[in-house]
């Protein structure tokens, strides 16, 4: 029977009645609840587009997690399967194998993982968590599941040990007791080793928690128990008594056996190692302080830092390895965390970049009574995982195939590109491989377990991450993997900061002045653009050849002209009478002269960073073509950039901030437009004026309130952006409420590129304020506050109270009058979205032309027309004319994204220039012609044609028809929340709008009708890291930074959810357990006990009895038989109820059938009698009746 899907019914109802929504668009629901209704389409002929997407195409599920496990706590290794497991403080477990085998699983409780133990070659894993619960994980499936859990109620777990090929797990507790758990049934045995029986009766003090458990390699019936206070007990399991006891003055941290079972080594809190012989337990056989200073004979060695762990591994043909962490001398406080390797008389200290959490020695054999033959050491650091090769004398490290260095510098932004040009990955890899670090071990990565294949998903994917130190990393994300391709350092463009220069020249940000804020990449043309936190934009071009050249830089002065706002000139002048006068002579081939003014002198017209003035050698790859910097204005640093876009076809880059918009021609290296946001509207007003050119170096009076007035209220205003990226660049993942995080800095905050700095407030007073006037305003009086709160939900800020008369509706009257008082009353609008496209700039346009869509934080959309030279030759010499078209569109909330569709409903891609190597000496630039790809049909230029423009803000989405500028569809996405990220993506060859809301909802809407396809409460927003890094891409995929060190990928495609099992790797592969070595006749006779030890007979219920029920509680896991029985029972119950309902329905149908049969019999009888009556009176005349 075909499955009935109620969502199809809803899709059909929505499609059949698109105008059923409220025309007012009012909605009281939260995110994901909204109304879809057509706009004003009366009398407008509209082509109905057949949409192919339905709700069956969408489903949300997580796919894979990349990066280093955040806050690691435990490490385990299976020497036969060769897989590695890492536990974290948040209850997560990452299981790693060969490249492509990377699995993430999570404890539901979220408790920290204390210890991990593999059931070697059994496809299972035991985890002990901080809530005193043991879990058994099944690894014989691609998504590991918990089979059993055992919750200890009265004791806290401190240590676990599972002997090789044993089904009995030893569990040590904080009280000093040792319990035994059956792995198969996960039931506690009645056999318990109490601490008071393990120590001598004469001892009155508690030995402390159990810190070590291990069975003797020589005799499985003997258990070594280590207590924290320095006591070691050798327990005979059969006789249930202590065979010997060892006492030491210093606390014990770890113990390890010699493979022969005659000696064991302990590490202590005073930095010493003690070697004990079972034949003479009264005192240590050997005591050493590896890093202590040598003392005179008879004196105790100098105490050192604790040795937290030691491993004692033997080799057949060489001296044993003694490997330990810690133990350095106290007088070397500046020394970094270290791992010491002692091999014979040689001592090697490996210094680490981060504190050591755990380490394990990887050995050839799983049997503890054989020569271990160690070949590598896996070292788990707080922020890294390294593996040291022990087979080479210099102990090199293996090259890590996993992307464990995503957080090498904190991630500040991300971008995700699916279905890229296929040659890009090979090109980037071939360039990046030349710059890889050298000195790695020449052997293969030792963690090589599991199995993985490419699966059905073969299209190329690239992830780009921007970092706090200015680096940009390109990653190959194809086929559910992540591998480094290429690394770009943007800081090489600038001069290095001197010791005393940083505070003076870079007051915009206190730390990380090169932090990457936004990235824009065109894969087809290979043009790459990046904006930094210090208000700069760098344009990179890709080249296969090395070049040495000077870096071209432009300095742009972007400010608010108060005089123009307050006193409009009465005469009317054309907005752009002479474009050549608009091109400022700010092209600087020698770099910027960033000279710091002496103390007390107002800074003006200097950038935050200094571009290198000397010729710079640029290796193959991305090479800087142009640097654009915003400069200080009258002592005020430039505002951070909030939006960025570039067009390789037009040769134009545009960016904006809270002050205004800048448009630059990067072919001719000239500034085309530098205009405040308010001037974009004024260009269509009655009082039209020529906008200020950046080259006009006007000196404003010191009492200019527009740019400096608020500094009187906040003296520390110059420190305003120091906390902008603090929460993103610090690796402390302390949860911060969204409202507090967004308002952390009272002077600047950026959510999704929306700047909310109060320094960008415009002045609405009718006169220029003097210093005395400003001091009066400081008192606030009964008049209006000096600045207001922006109404956009994504632009929260700490500001003064908002008065009623200052509240502005998010609607905009298209027929604007010459008065701009309503705009003057508002805070300045930030440029939040930019988009280049061939479109209709005005209502009366009959053909498409190059346009720039500009979206603001107050929901306004301004179309700017770009008039380009007609030929390629003129493009390098003739100026580009940039004219605001006078077309305005409006939405609720800050504008987030744009996109266009042609009249057939196909998504239109912005035009681009085909890539060519700018440094190719074989081509003559003068004879070479630019190859442009225009992604629209020739029929779209015909008279009367139109296109659909999709605009999404943080509150709603609208679809406009151009050039008529009629709103066809409106969808009010949310009223109580706001959208953080929105993008128009391609799914199954159809376009749809994907949105991520602040309250965790992911919503998908079809285009152009904006019908809801999916609304899932996926992820509650707990910190701004997710908001800043969440991004959608084509083919139903998305990603975000789930922790400071990890990237989480997810899919909203039903097809990918169905095929996810085929894309993941197998953790378990059938491998025969290696056979134990033959010990020989003499070793078997004299080397130790040769008798077998039956743990089942000793620990089973028959001999040991049952454990107390109150001690531990057994919890069946979802993957266990009990869990499956429960689920099956639930299914059977549902089937039973369905069968009963079916029987009742069948009974009613039977009764109805009987009634129907009776009615049919009556009808036949009536028909028969009627026929007989007709025959009786057929031949009679009327007068015979």
From Swiss-Prot:
Keyword tags: Acetylation, Cell membrane, Coiled coil, Cytoplasm, Exocytosis, Membrane, Methylation, Phosphoprotein, Protein transport, Repeat, Transport, Ubl conjugation, WD repeat
User: What stretches of residues are WD repeats?
Assistant: 73-106, 113-152, 157-193, 212-246, 252-284, 306-348, 356-390, 412-489, 517-628, 642-704, 831-888, 897-968, 973-1017, 1031-1054
Q: What highest taxon heads this organism's lineage? A: Eukaryota
Extract the signal peptide range.
Answer: none
Task: Give the molecular function GO annotations.
Answer: syntaxin binding
Q: List Omega-N-methylarginine occurrences by residue.
A: 708
Q: Name one GO biological process term.
A: protein transport
* Location within or outside the cell: Cytoplasm; Cell membrane; Membrane
Q: Where is this region: Disordered?
A: 15-44, 567-601, 747-770
**Feature: compositional bias, Low complexity:** 16-26, 578-592
Modification N-acetylmethionine occurs at: 1
Stretches assigned to the v-SNARE coiled-coil homology domain: 1120-1180
Matching entries from InterPro entries are given as: Lethal2_giant, Lgl_C_dom, LLGL2, V_SNARE_CC, WD40/YVTN_repeat-like_dom_sf, WD40_repeat_CS, WD40_repeat_dom_sf, WD40_rpt
SMART domains, per the entry: WD40
Q: What happens when the gene is disrupted?
A: Mutant mice are born at the expected Mendelian rate and show normal body weight development. However, they display reduced sensorimotor gating and impaired motor performance.
Q: Could you tell me which residues carry Phosphothreonine? A: 567, 595, 1092
Decide whether keyword Magnesium is in the record: no
Q: How is it modified after translation?
A: Phosphorylated, leading to STXBP5L increased turnover and subsequent de-repression of insulin secretion. Phosphorylated on serine residues in response to glucose or phorbol esters.
Tissue pattern of expression reads: Detected in hippocampus and cerebellum. Expressed in pancreatic beta-cells where it modulates insulin secretion.
User: Record's PANTHER family?
Assistant: LETHAL 2 GIANT LARVAE PROTEIN (PTHR10241), SYNTAXIN-BINDING PROTEIN 5-LIKE (PTHR10241:SF19)
- State the family named in the UniProt similarity comment for this chain: Belongs to the WD repeat L(2)GL family.
Q: What does this protein do?
A: Plays a role in vesicle trafficking and exocytosis inhibition. In pancreatic beta-cells, inhibits insulin secretion probably by interacting with and regulating STX1A and STX4, key t-SNARE proteins involved in the fusion of insulin granules to the plasma membrane. Also plays a role in neurotransmitter release by inhibiting basal acetylcholine release from axon terminals and by preventing synaptic fatigue upon repetitive stimulation. Promotes as well axonal outgrowth.
Q: Kindly provide the name given to this protein in its UniProt entry.
A: Syntaxin-binding protein 5-like
This chain is encoded by the gene named: Stxbp5l
